[in-house]
């Protein structure tokens, strides 16, 4: 009896398990059927998409004059730098410049107390006047002695002595004249003037201080910035190109760009080339000169130098984005009239971040693919589309209304 009841319990449990399994399967099949259809439909759509021409962007190779530049790093240096010092000793009485001021050669910069130099000049002038009178008297005596000598009233010895006295007085007079000139020069040097055109820096000494000609710091440093120079370096491999460009007889144009190489500061000309290569760095120094009338360049400023050495005429130019690299070298995808692509191996020339010169393998007017290149195969047909601008991206899709001013305002308020 107990075994019969036990068997009946197992049968009932089995029926329940089978029923639950059937229910779960039915629900799973009901939910999977729509998604399976969707996946199947998506697969068919994907197949249709795969057979459509790949969208690409293209550009036309153009013919133009392309400049060739050599680039290097450099530092702006003053054309001349002078430490203005006093040539005489004395007390600094006045300063006649403002720090940072542009001055001309000969402008008064400072004054030393001139009192002692005026006194010395007066003494020298007095001595000169005295000795000039002495010389005049000696010459008159000599004239009388010469007259008396004709009648033998004076001896030859006395006549020679008087002649020597005149010569001595003449020598003394010349020494006095030199002393006067020296005293005048000392007085002139008490007025310190600018030796060159340039910009004065910060003053190194204040009014009232005792200064001397032996002071090494000087009164102020004067730098000539109109014109101003740029000293930059180029690799030794560029020397031949520079020398060849110089032999053409035309001045080489040099541009100074800022530290980030994004803004051109000024344009000048190559002034000179160093006579030896730096063996440590393998570079050579060059110097360019700039008028710098707008003061765009400043001494010790770091800049990027670009020197134009040649211009390639009628060069075939394409966007850099079109140039690709493969196992056989550089190549581009060229479009024919039917918008089918073919791979062309090319030889490149001058290149920058935006464009590249093609020296072989392409002609002006050829169309090259610039975007969508990764989907291309030889002979594939493509659909050339225009590059989407920011304004186009902001336009609403067809059937979608543009937001009104009130909607934009409400969105702005929520944000």
From Swiss-Prot:
Membrane topology: Peripheral membrane protein
Disordered: annotated segments: 387-415
Signal peptide start-end: 1-21
InterPro entries (alphabetical): CusB_D23, Multidrug-R_MdtA, RND_pump_MFP
GO cellular component: efflux pump complex; plasma membrane
GO MF annotations, alphabetized: efflux transmembrane transporter activity
Statement: the UniProt record of this protein carries the keyword Acyltransferase: no
Compositionally biased region (Basic and acidic residues): 394-403
Main location: membrane
Location of this chain's protein in the cell: Cell inner membrane
Matching Pfam families: HlyD_D23 (PF16576)
Keywords associated with the record: Cell inner membrane, Cell membrane, Membrane, Signal, Transport
Superkingdom of this protein's organism: Bacteria
Subunit structure: Part of a tripartite efflux system composed of MdtA, MdtB and MdtC.
NCBIfam families, per database record: PRK11556.1, RND_mfp
PANTHER family: MULTIDRUG RESISTANCE PROTEIN MDTA (PTHR30469:SF12)
Family: Belongs to the membrane fusion protein (MFP) (TC 8.A.1) family.
The protein, known as: Multidrug resistance protein MdtA
């Amino acid at each position: 009896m107990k075994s019969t009841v036990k068997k009946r319990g197992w049968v009932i449990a089995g029926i329940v398990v089978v029923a639950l399994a059937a229910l779960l399967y039915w629900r799973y099949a009901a939910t999977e059927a729509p998604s399976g259809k969707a996946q199947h439909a998506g697969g068919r759509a994907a197949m249709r998409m795969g057979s459509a021409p790949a969208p690409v962007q293209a550009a036309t190779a153009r013919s133009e004059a392309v400049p060739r530049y050599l680039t290097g790093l450099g530092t702006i240096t003053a054309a001349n730098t002078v430490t203005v010092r006093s040539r005489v000793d004395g007390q600094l009485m006045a300063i006649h410049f403002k720090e940072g001021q542009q001055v001309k050669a000969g402008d008064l910069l400072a004054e030393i107390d001139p009192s002692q130099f005026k006194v010395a000049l007066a003494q020298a002038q007095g001595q000169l006047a005295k000795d000039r009178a002495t010389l005049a008297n000696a010459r008159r005596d000599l004239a009388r002695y010469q007259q008396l000598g004709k009648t033998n009233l004076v001896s030859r010895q006395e006549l020679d002595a008087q002649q020597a006295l005149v010569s001595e007085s003449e020598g003394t007079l010349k020494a006095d004249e030199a002393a006067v000139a020296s005293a005048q020069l000392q007085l002139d040097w008490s007025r310190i003037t600018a030796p060159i055109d340039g910009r004065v820096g910060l003053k190194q000494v204040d009014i009232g201080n005792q200064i001397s000609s032996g002071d090494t710091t000087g009164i102020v440093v004067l730098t000539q910035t109109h014109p101003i120079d740029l000293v930059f370096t180029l690799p030794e491999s560029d020397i031949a190109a520079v020398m060849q460009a110089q032999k053409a007889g035309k001045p080489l144009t040099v541009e100074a760009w800022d530290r980030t190489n994004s803004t051109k500061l000024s344009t000048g000309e190559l002034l000179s080339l160093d006579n030896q290569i730096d063996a440590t760095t393998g570079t050579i120094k060059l110097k360019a000169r700039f008028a710098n009338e707008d003061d765009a360049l400043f001494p010790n400023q770091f800049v990027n130098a670009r020197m134009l050495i040649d211009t390639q005429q009628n060069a075939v130019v394409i966007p850099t984005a079109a140039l690709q690299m493969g196992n056989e070298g550089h190549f581009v995808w060229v479009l024919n009239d039917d918008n089918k692509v073919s791979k062309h191996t090319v030889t490149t020339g001058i290149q920058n971040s935006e464009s590249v010169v093609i020296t072989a393998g392409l002609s002006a007017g050829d169309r090259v693919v610039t975007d969508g290149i990764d989907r291309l195969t030889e002979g594939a047909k493509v659909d050339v589309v225009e590059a989407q601008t920011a304004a186009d991206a902001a336009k609403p899709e067809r059937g979608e209304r543009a937001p009104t001013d009130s909607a934009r305002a409400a969105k702005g308020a929520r944000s």
